[in-house]
Each structure stands twice: as C-alpha cells, then as structure tokens.
From Swiss-Prot:
Native species: Pelobacter propionicus (strain DSM 2379 / NBRC 103807 / OttBd1)
Binding site for anthranilate 2: 180
EC class name: transferase
Binding site for anthranilate 1: 94, 125
TM region positions: none
Note accompanying the cofactor annotation: Binds 2 magnesium ions per monomer.
Similarity comment text for this entry: Belongs to the anthranilate phosphoribosyltransferase family.
Residues annotated as binding Mg(2+) 2: 239-240
GO molecular function: anthranilate phosphoribosyltransferase activity; magnesium ion binding
Positions contributing to Mg(2+) 1 binding: 106, 240
InterPro entries: Anthranilate_Pribosyl_Tfrase (IPR005940), Glycosyl_Trfase_fam3 (IPR000312), Glycosyl_Trfase_fam3_N_dom (IPR017459), Glycosyl_Trfase_fam3_N_dom_sf (IPR036320), Nuc_phospho_transferase (IPR035902)
Self-association and partners: Homodimer.
Protein name per Swiss-Prot or TrEMBL: Anthranilate phosphoribosyltransferase
Length: 350
C-alpha cells in the first residue's frame, strides 16, 4: 500500500483516512522500508497533510502506544440507559519547533493545573530544536523519567500529575526514527505526538508552531473524540498562548470547532517582550519553573496563568478564563503548585 500511496501523493492526490491507517500500519510494524518511509513523509509534507490523513495516522499511533490507565470509568446503571462517566484527564502540550526558545511554559502549567484538582497526563520528550524540552527540564528539577508505565499510572492516580515520556511509550516509532533524522525536515510526525497521548487524555490544550495548523488540528482533535480542548498559536510564533501579542485559538467541543483571536489585555495582562519569556538550558529553565511555582511575579508568571486558565476551562474546572486565572493564581500563591512538583519528584524516586 505504501508504494501506491507515495505514487498518489506525488501527484498531489489526498489519501482517505482508511488508506492512511493502512500505510501507517505498515510503518508502525516495520513492514515499510526506511526508503519508503522517507519518501512517503517527504511527499506528504510537500503536498500538505489533510485532516483525514492526520486523523488516520493518529489513530494508528494511538493503537500502537503503550497504554497508561490513569482514570477510572464509572458505570452508572441507576437509570433507564447505561452511562459511562469517564474521569477527566488533561494534557497540555506543544508541537515544539517554534524557534522562540522560551522557558517551558506548558510544563509549568501542568503543575498549576494539577494543583487545582485536575488530573494531568503531561506528554512530552527531550529537546529537538530548542535548548530544553519538557523531559530535560523535569529531569533537572529532580523528576526520575526512567520509570515503568505502572509507576506513571500511580503518579497520575495518586498525586494527580504524571509525565508520559514519549520514547518510552511509543516503541513502534523506532521504525521512523532513522528516516526522520536523515531527511531533517518537519513531517507529519512532528504533529502526531501531541495528538497521541497514551493516557487517552480527553481534554487538551495543544500549541502549534504555525497558524495554518490551528484549525486543521482542531478538526483532527474533534474527529478523535476530544471532549473539550484548545489549539493555540501565538502570532509571535509561540506554540503557546502568548502575552507579547495576539493568539489564534480554536476551541474544540463535542459539537464542533470555533475560531477566535485573543489579546492579553482582554484578560488583564500587560504585554511583554519575547526576551522576558526566553529560557536557556535545562538548568536555567529549572530555576525559572521553580521561581514561577514559588510565586515570583512578572511576565513569566503571567504567561503561565493565561495558559493555565485555558487548560482549566478545557477541563471544565472553570466556566471562563477570567474565573480560571483566579484559580490558577491561588494554586501558586498557596504553595500547592510547588507541592505538586515535590510530590512528583518523591513518587518517581520511591
């Protein structure tokens, strides 16, 4: 199938979701050769990935991931119909590759949101293009990443936050590592990671590196069954909600997708410069994360609060971003957010 798919894509013809599922199945099981994988993802990048193609690829990648069972399904039979009430699991994640070299905003947000009572399954990896990825900063903070899937599950169920280290949970991706490294360009795999949380997070804030991906990936999340989420792109290039300028946001609900643009002033934040948000290596970024969680005021706290607010809305912990900002600020100022970091360090080392 992959040979036929390459021929079609080279002619600028789209694949159906079913066809993409078949091709990705060949890639994830080692049936496709490295040359075929490289040709396929390059041709797909040149054509441009469709919602159908990304959705099909994400379904296969989810299927092959090591499953993290972090929530409980509650069966309610005290009704005429049977209803399964799933416990909310949230992910805050970005595609990376935005080139801004800011500190680890979404990683900091994860601790704040979990301190508000939301179970967070933070999916991430080491740095690819920036100085410090989420795994790098967590390791520097003292979190042990070399843990079993069962321990990850315990982190989420016992303390409300766990880190899902992508390489450890997406073993089938090993077949694509060589071709991806050798061609050295962004491909569909750069956007699949945030779509394939192994804990099955049904609520999400996903940052993307270019504005053209906002509506497209929101459509994919909707197709994949996201209950409530936001896909965001700061118009300064950040794969976060930014406080330097406006942010393009797509809200995903079970009924569809809606698009809007927000400005930091609308939520009571002053604009800052990109330099005020920049990070450094893992050591520098770990210091920044600690300072924000300890309550230090300034632009770094502001950008964490605004991103945490939308995460809390996605998890239905607050009805509006304004309400959510107050919850996030209280979680930091009370010390609960910092306590979540301490708990994660402890549980991963026990």
């Amino acid at each position: 199938m992959i040979k036929k798919a390459i021929a079609r894509i080279v002619e600028q013809k789209d694949l159906t979701e079913g066809e993409m599922i078949e091709v990705m199945g060949q890639i994830m099981t080692g049936e496709a050769t490295p040359a075929q994988i490289g040709a396929f993802i390059t041709a797909l990048r040149m054509k441009g990935e469709t919602i159908d193609e990304i959705t099909g690829a994400a379904r296969v990648m989810r299927e092959h991931a090591t499953r993290i069972r972090a929530g409980k399904d509650l069966l309610d039979i005290d009704r005429d119909d049977i209803n399964i009430d799933r416990e909310t699991i949230l992910d805050v994640v970005g595609t990376g590759g935005d080139g801004t070299n800011t500190f680890n905003v979404s990683t900091t947000v994860a601790f704040v949101v979990s301190a508000c009572g939301v179970k967070v399954a933070k999916h991430g990896n080491r740095s690819v293009s920036s100085l410090c990825g989420s795994a790098d900063v967590l390791e520097k903070l003292g979190v042990n990443l070399d843990i079993t899937p069962e321990t990850v599950e315990q982190c989420i169920t016992k303390i409300g936050i766990g880190f899902l280290f992508a390489p450890a949970l997406h073993g089938a991706m090993r077949y694509a590592i060589g071709p991806r490294r050798e061609i050295g360009i962004r491909t569909i795999f750069n956007i699949l990671g945030p779509l394939t949380n192994p804990a099955g997070a049904d609520c999400q804030v996903m940052g993307v590196y270019r504005p053209g991906l906002v509506e497209k990936l929101a459509g994919v999340l909707h197709r994949l069954g996201c209950r409530h989420g936001f896909v965001v792109h700061g118009m300064d290039g950040m794969d976060e909600i930014t406080t330097t300028t406006e942010t393009l946001i797509a809200e995903v609900t079970t009924s569809g997708v809606s698009i809007c643009t927000i400005h930091p002033e609308e939520l009571g934040f002053s604009r800052c410069s990109m330099d005020e948000l920049r990070g450094g290596d893992a050591t520098a970024n770990a210091d920044i994360v600690r300072s924000v969680l300890q309550g230090v005021a300034g632009p770094r706290r502001d950008i964490v609060l605004i991103n945490a607010a939308y995460a809390l809305v996605a998890a239905d912990r607050a009805a509006t971003p304004e309400q959510a900002i107050a919850l996030a600020a209280e979680a930091i100022d009370s010390g609960r957010a910092m306590e979540q970091l301490r708990k994660l360090i402890q549980i991963t080392k026990d």
